């Protein structure tokens, strides 16, 4: 018996049902890698960020997430080079879906119980996504804006429902606006830290502030 189509599990009908000591024997998710491209690029190298945002409350299978990841990565490598971007899949498939297997061979009615004891066995995992939640993000250089939009557009076809493509006003994967980012770094209010930044608040010990601005 093959894999049941994902359209059967598209809608969020049940409560979240994660893998646990009560829910065992769950097959591994198809998606194992969530970050691609130049992951260790400094925060100031990739200022532009594009998001794919869900427009529906639904479930996305781990197979669909993997297919979208491969599709976006292939296009970005071809158009920007393998070191010209950083893709991050922002959903993780934690919800376990079940299947109540039915036999279809001759004499099946003697072997199975139909809908008696219909709580199924784990079949796979899906990610539950809300309206306005980000599915996938890409950060890159400013000149690659059109390539980001096209990569996300191609990846959209791997998912059910509707998604929107949004070019962020933030700097890269940070939560700070792009127009204020460089000023705050110059004033040492933000300290670059890998692909993110550390925020230095106004409060705190004066000695630390003096050491930072010396």
UniProtKB/Swiss-Prot annotation:
PROSITE patterns: RIBOSOMAL_L10E. GO terms for biological process: cell differentiation; male meiosis I; ribosomal large subunit assembly; spermatogenesis; translation. It comes from the Eukaryota. Pfam families: Ribosomal_L16. Belongs to the universal ribosomal protein uL16 family. This is Large ribosomal subunit protein uL16-like. InterPro entries: Ribosomal_uL16, Ribosomal_uL16_CS_euk_arc, Ribosomal_uL16_dom, Ribosomal_uL16_euk_arch, Ribosomal_uL16_sf. Gene3D superfamilies: 3.30.60.300, Ribosomal protein L10e/L16 (3.90.1170.10). Testis-specific component of the ribosome, which is required for the transition from prophase to metaphase in male meiosis I. Compensates for the inactivated X-linked RPL10 paralog during spermatogenesis. The ribosome is a large ribonucleoprotein complex responsible for the synthesis of proteins in the cell. The small ribosomal subunit (SSU) binds messenger RNAs (mRNAs) and translates the encoded message by selecting cognate aminoacyl-transfer RNA (tRNA) molecules. Signal peptide: none annotated. The keyword Ribosomal protein applies. It is found in: Cytoplasm. Its main location: cytoplasm. Keywords: Cytoplasm, Differentiation, Meiosis, Ribonucleoprotein, Ribosomal protein, Spermatogenesis. One of its GO terms (molecular function) is structural constituent of ribosome. Component of the 60S large ribosomal subunit (LSU). GO terms for cellular component: cytosolic large ribosomal subunit; endoplasmic reticulum; nucleus; ribosome.
